[in-house]
């Protein structure tokens, strides 16, 4: 099964907790703090695997979690850093944040990697909190939570040449003639339901990748038929071979077919119409096809289409196929490469930016609830198992303006205050 679009959940690993420990050694009566730091949590990393062609592997597994870092130990020993979770994707995969729509990256080159969820840093051990006032601190940090997000993976087939046209105009047949690909071929519409790729190898040593794309019909750019589901694959092709059948009995006019496909491509993305295009008249072995082709070619020439960009072929007899492939290779030499989708560029900005506002709300039972990224992160990294750690967290809250915010919200001494799942009493 061909899968080209999927949403997955990624959870990076939490950093390891820092350690509260002291040096205990013979003849060293005041060894001091010796708690080590926690190890970094594992990140979620996507990488391009040349052997993959679809996102099929994500059909049955859509949740990925990296390991947490190891906790710090005594004797200033650091916790072990967790291994990153590496996930293979095919070349041509665009990664976006499912919630914001931000493009995180466009994976097009073999071996290319992208970090989609960063592991949390390890918490610091008590050896970092020594001060002149507290030479034996019982303070440490818990590991930082790893990033969590939902991402959307969208595969756009990477091919040099794309075959476009109405259903059953001979795209799959042409691909099977010029490559070793074995697409499904039958005399009914929408035989091709997935893109098929093949390598064209010419006698002069030139080669290129050709993609047989599912047939388009009127309204495809609005989702009719296979619609946008496969129009996206045209975006990554450098040259288009536009196939138009000359069958006198199909009930359609070749020029109308040509115009309709061009209209749908332009409605989806007008940049596609700027790509080099060769017009290919197919099924020229049928009776009456030559007359239809003569009228069709005359109409194209009148519109300014170059004569050397119009071909007539029969995939059944292989007539005209070799000249078409050589011309395609010639056009490819000067055809521009597609521009990868630009990921949001993350640059360091050292200008002052205020922290997101601390929010104080009140539950129906009278408990004041504190929310905000900074305060929630500080809480998750606070080790409240020791009095020193609890006092440090209280000082952090005060420095963030929590006391003033609670008073402004009407809190009085003795009222309950909640952060996440932790509840404490407000004391003036």
UniProtKB/Swiss-Prot annotation:
Give cofactor(s), names only.
Mg(2+)
Q: Which residues bind GTP?
A: 165-172, 190-194, 212-215, 282-285, 314-316
- Tell me the ranges covered by the Obg domain, including all copies: 1-158
Instruction: Locate the residues binding Mg(2+).
Output: 172, 192
What GO terms are given for molecular function? GTP binding; GTPase activity; magnesium ion binding
A Pfam family annotated for this UniProt entry: MMR_HSR1
Residue ranges of every copy of the OBG-type G domain listed in the record: 159-333
Identify the keywords attached in UniProt to this record, alphabetized: Cytoplasm, GTP-binding, Hydrolase, Magnesium, Metal-binding, Nucleotide-binding
Biological process terms in GO annotation = ribosome biogenesis
Q: Which residues form the OCT domain?
A: 350-428
- Subcellular location per the Swiss-Prot or TrEMBL entry: Cytoplasm
Q: What class does this enzyme belong to in the EC scheme?
A: hydrolase
Answer whether the UniProt record assigns the keyword Nucleotide-binding to this protein: yes
GO cellular component annotations of the record: cytoplasm
**EC number(s)?**
3.6.5.-
Q: How does it assemble?
A: Monomer.
Biological role stated in the UniProt entry? An essential GTPase which binds GTP, GDP and possibly (p)ppGpp with moderate affinity, with high nucleotide exchange rates and a fairly low GTP hydrolysis rate. Plays a role in control of the cell cycle, stress response, ribosome biogenesis and in those bacteria that undergo differentiation, in morphogenesis control.
UniProt xrefs under HAMAP family: GTPase_Obg
Protein name in the entry: GTPase Obg
What gene does the UniProt entry assign to this protein?
A: obg
């Amino acid at each position: 099964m061909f899968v080209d679009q999927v949403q997955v959940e990624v959870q990076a690993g939490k950093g390891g907790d820092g350690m509260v420990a002291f040096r205990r050694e013979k003849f060293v009566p005041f060894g001091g703090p010796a708690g080590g730091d926690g190890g970094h949590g594992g990140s979620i990393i996507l990488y391009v695997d040349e052997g993959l062609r679809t996102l099929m592997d994500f059909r049955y597994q859509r949740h990925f979690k990296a390991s947490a870092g190891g906790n710090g130990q005594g004797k200033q020993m650091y916790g072990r850093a967790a291994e990153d979770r590496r996930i293979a994707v095919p070349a041509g995969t665009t990664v976006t944040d499912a919630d914001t729509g931000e493009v995180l990256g466009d994976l097009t080159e073999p071996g290319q990697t992208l970090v989609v969820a960063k592991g949390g840093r390890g918490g610091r051990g008590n050896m970092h909190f020594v001060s002149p006032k507290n030479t034996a601190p019982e303070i440490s940090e818990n590991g930082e939570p790893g990033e969590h997000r939902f991402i959307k993976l969208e595969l756009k087939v990477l091919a040099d040449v794309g075959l476009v046209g109405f259903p059953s105009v001979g795209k799959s047949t042409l691909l099977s003639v010029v490559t070793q690909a074995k697409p499904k071929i039958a005399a009914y519409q929408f035989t091709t339901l997935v893109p098929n790729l093949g390598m064209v190898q010419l006698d002069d040593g030139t080669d290129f990748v050709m993609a047989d794309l599912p047939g388009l019909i009127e309204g495809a750019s609005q989702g009719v038929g296979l619609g946008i589901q496969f129009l996206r694959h045209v975006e990554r092709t450098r040259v288009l071979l536009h196939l138009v059948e000359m069958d006198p009995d199909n009930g359609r006019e070749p020029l109308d077919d040509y115009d309709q496909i061009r209209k749908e491509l332009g409605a989806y993305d007008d940049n596609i119409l700027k790509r080099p295009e060769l017009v290919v008249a197919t099924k020229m072995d049928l009776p009456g096809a030559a007359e239809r082709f003569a009228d069709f070619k005359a109409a194209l020439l009148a519109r300014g289409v170059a004569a050397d960009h119009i071909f007539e072929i029969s995939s059944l007899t292989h007539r005209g196929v070799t000249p078409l492939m050589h011309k395609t290779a010639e056009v490819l030499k000067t055809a521009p490469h597609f521009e990868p989708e630009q990921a949001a560029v993350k640059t360091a900005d050292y200008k002052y930016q205020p922290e997101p506002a601390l929010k104080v709300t009140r539950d129906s039972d009278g408990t004041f609830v504190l929310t905000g990224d900074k305060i929630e992160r500080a809480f998750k990294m606070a080790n409240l198992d020791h009095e020193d750690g609890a006092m440090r967290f209280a000082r952090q809250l005060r420095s963030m303006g929590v006391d003033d915010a609670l008073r402004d919200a009407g809190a009085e001494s003795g009222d309950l205050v909640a952060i996440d799942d932790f509840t404490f009493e407000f004391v003036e």
